[in-house]
Amino acid sequence: MRTKRRTPGRRGWRWVVWALVGVLVSAAGIAGVVVWQNTYALREETVSLRHDGKVLKGVLARPETGGGPFGLVVFVHGDGPVDATHETFYRPLWESFARAGYASLSFDKPGTGGSEGDWLDQSMADRADETLAAVAWARGRPDIDGRRIGLWGASQAGWVLPKVAARDRRLQFVIAVSPAVNWLRQGRYNLLAELRRDGATAQERQAALRRRQTTLDLLERGASFAEYRAEVGDVDGMTPARWSFIAENYRSDATADLCAMRGTPVLLVLAGHDINVDVAETEAVYREILPARSLTVAHYPAAAHSLVDHDLERSRWRLTLTAIVAPRKLYTGRFLAEQASFVQRLDTGEEVRRPDTGDGAARPDTGTGADRPGTCKGTVRPGTCKGTS
């Protein structure tokens, strides 16, 4: 017996069509939200700078409206092969500064993006020279107010920012995000913090410290990468270029340069869940050396080293989704708003140490930091500057 195939009636087809329309509209809506959330109130211009015989490529991000001259925030990267936008991570910051009337300038690290050279060939002094060249280049532009140029830097930039500010006393400010003071102490702190996080046993901890000491002994005697590899066996991702970079920079300490830059307004940004940097030591040294009247310290208790919320950073899928759908929400609490308010207060001549409200809890330095010329006391760490005017 033959059966008649049933086909959807007009109402059935109509339901299918409307269901498809709904799916398409939803998809278009989501796509629209993603596009909107990744669109910033900025005018970005690709720029280039010749420095030390090499061309550096970068981005100048100006406020969306106005002809300037604008203030300028020059970005100084942390460790690694960072491009000008830090894979777009900087753009929310640029937008916040733009709302305060400041442009942002950032270059691809040498050997990254469009820049020539190799960042692993650089010392911290080389990085400071590069930053000074960027500042000088910016002062030559009619759309930039040369009196309103400051620095923003994170992590490893903590050894670069003070060098630059010590040599260019015209800088309006320095914003130091999660900086360390001493390379060796920072390395030990980071190692032990990661071992605690990973639940290492006492034996594993001692083995890691022995390996670290072996590495330091090799660095002290100027050993080659081949000698390092022969001594430790598993190089754990170390490359010859990275070994050379560490050998060049492992003695870095910001203390003397912090003394030399005293008087420049500084915003010190510290995270509550930082396992890379000993924020207690950093804060103590900054408060000891820098005048109270020029230092603002902002604590973000929920943040990790990157100023992303610690809980968000621990969830890869949430972190990825947030980066795509709501990139401004990557940063903790009121971090973005308080970056902008710091430079705005400098522009208006308002007291820069006034506490902010919100999660950042920026507050003035109330310690006994060196307020008077000639007093840069050495009570925090051996070697802290003394008698620096």
Region spans (language model):
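Conserved alpha/beta-hydrolase
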Residues: W94-G114
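The serine-hydrolase catalytic nucleophile loop
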Residues: V82-L93, K109, A280
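Accessory cap/linker subdomain of secreted extracellular hydrolases
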Residues: I175-A260
